[in-house]
């Protein structure tokens, strides 16, 4: 008798968060491992076993830049097929704390005025769409592929 077992793909959930402060500031961070570019992006990281997505947003933000966030809300998701990641996008608001960088992950992080953004991720990435949503009020589509 032959038993067939199903192989389910292993997907690694990652949270990525756009954090605003007040009506006109956005937190952007520079990845310490990206030494060839002056590009700033968003806070992101893997979800740990037993953790909710919202808890992952709060933990990653506290670990990487030392601040607390509030009003964490889901925005969208984007598959990254190599290496099997699913980027799950959230927006949050600054709650408290001073920026204190996890230097092995983040080389710089600042709150930028919406009209004074540094170099940001390319159009077509979920990070770019999230930054535009926060700074220019672009809508989030029901289908993430339309939003990007």
Residue ranges of each PLM-predicted region?
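Active-site-adjacent "gating/activation" loops or surface patches in catalytic cores
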Residues: 20-36
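Nudix hydrolase/Nudix homology domain
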Residues: 35-40, 102-148
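The catalytic Nudix box helix
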Residues: 42-76, 90, 98
């Amino acid at each position: 008798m032959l038993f067939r077992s199903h192989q389910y793909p292993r997907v690694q959930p990652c949270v990525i968060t756009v954090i605003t402060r007040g009506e006109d500031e956005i937190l952007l961070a520079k990845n310490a491992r990206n030494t060839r570019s002056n590009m700033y992006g968003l806070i992101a990281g893997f979800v740990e076993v037993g953790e909710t997505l919202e808890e992952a947003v709060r933990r990653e933000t506290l670990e990487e830049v030392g601040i607390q966030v509030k009003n964490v809300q889901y925005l969208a998701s984007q598959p990254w097929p190599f290496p099997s990641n699913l980027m799950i996008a959230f927006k949050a608001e600054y709650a408290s704390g001073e920026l204190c960088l996890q230097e092995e992950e983040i080389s710089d992080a600042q709150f930028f005025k919406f009209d004074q953004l540094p170099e940001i991720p390319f159009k077509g990435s979920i990070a770019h769409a999230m930054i535009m949503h926060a700074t220019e009020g672009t809508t989030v589509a029901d289908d993430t592929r339309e939003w990007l």
